[in-house]
Amino acid sequence: MSHNDTIPLYQSSQSDIDEIENMMNDSFQSGPGTVLPARPPSPIRPSIPVSSSPFVQSNLPPLPPSSSSSTQKVMPVPAPPPLPSAGNEGNKSIGGSGFGSPPNTLTEPVWDTVKRDLSRIVSNLKLVVFPNPYREDPGKALRDWDLWGPFFFIVFLGLTLSWSASVKKSEVFAVAFALLAAGAVILTLNVLLLGGHIIFFQSLSLLGYCLFPLDVGAVICMLKDNVILKMVVVSVTLAWSSWAAYPFMSAAVNPRRKALALYPVFLMYVSVGFLIIAIN
């Protein structure tokens, strides 16, 4: 077969070729119009970093090192004091330095307790019997108040009056003790009802300590049986006791009600002075 020879096509083959060409033309013509728009791309989601450490790290940049920290010298840490060996030395070091728990007073010797109470009584007695008029806050002088001192002075005054009496010694002691104890309670309630800023037992302690000058006067009058001497001694000790109670009671109440608080105190001390003079 030469190149000039051609293969004749049948009618069915020619129609198939024409049909394929028509379909291809139709597909090219209708293609651009029926293509759906492309789906917009989804936004990029931020990724969450996963850390294996239990603490969340901050995104803030680290602070730059200061120049002073590089030049600053590291101070050496002082070594702790050596522990006491054992026994009484350890207790003395803790109690003397003031560190640790306070000493247990339940296990201390009786003599140490008595010395501590006596020193407290002497300190409070100095504050009351010798008041300082220039003290900034005289009303708070008895912060460490106690009732042993006032109880002792009340009992001592009752015993002194009973020893001075020639008859009915027990009745004299009962009257003196009841007068002083009930009078101190009534005077304290009077100050509180007047709006005074004072503790109940602190006021009882104060009024009991102020009886010390009258105790001294009762002892002098018991030793010297002279009416004129008794009157002079009682007048001096009465003024002393009133002067000792004045700064504390006046500071506890309103200045407008000062007389209402001081007059009953003076009246009770006058009654005690009358008992000292009258008992023979």
UniProtKB/Swiss-Prot annotation:
Pfam family, one: Yip1
Gene deletion effect: No visible phenotype. The double mutant yip4a yip4b exhibits disturbed trans-Golgi network (TGN)-Golgi association and cell elongation defects leading to reduced roots and hypocotyls growth associated with an abnormal cell wall composition and a mislocalization of trans-Golgi network (TGN)-localized proteins SYP61 and VHA-a1. The double mutant yip4a yip4b also has a reduced number of root trichoblasts displaying Rho-of-plant (ROPs e.g. ARAC4/ROP2, ARAC5/ROP4 and ARAC3/ROP6) patches and leading to an almost complete absence of root hairs.
Single GO term (MF): protein homodimerization activity
Tissue: Expressed in developing root hair cells.
Entry's Gene Ontology cellular component terms: endosome; Golgi apparatus; plasma membrane; trans-Golgi network; trans-Golgi network membrane
Main subcellular location: Golgi
Region of interest: Disordered: 1-106
GO biological process per UniProt: endoplasmic reticulum to Golgi vesicle-mediated transport; pectin biosynthetic process; plant organ development; plant-type cell wall cellulose biosynthetic process; polysaccharide transport; protein transport; regulation of protein transport; root development
Location relative to the cell: Golgi apparatus, trans-Golgi network membrane
Lumenal side: 168-171, 214-230, 280
Record function comment: Together with YIP4A, involved in the regulation of cell elongation during root and hypocotyl growth. YIP4A and YIP4B are central trafficking components in Rho-of-plant (ROPs, e.g. ARAC4/ROP2, ARAC5/ROP4 and ARAC3/ROP6) small GTPases-dependent root hair formation, thus contributing to activation and plasma membrane accumulation of ROPs during hair initiation. The ECH/YIP4 complex is involved in the modulation of the trans-Golgi network (TGN)-mediated trafficking of some proteins and cell wall components (e.g.
Subunit-level organization: Homodimer and heterodimer with YIP4A. Component of a trans-Golgi network (TGN)-localized ECH/YIP4 complex made of ECH, YIP4A and YIP4B. Interacts directly with ECH.
Protein name: Protein YIP4b
Gene from which the chain derives: YIP4B
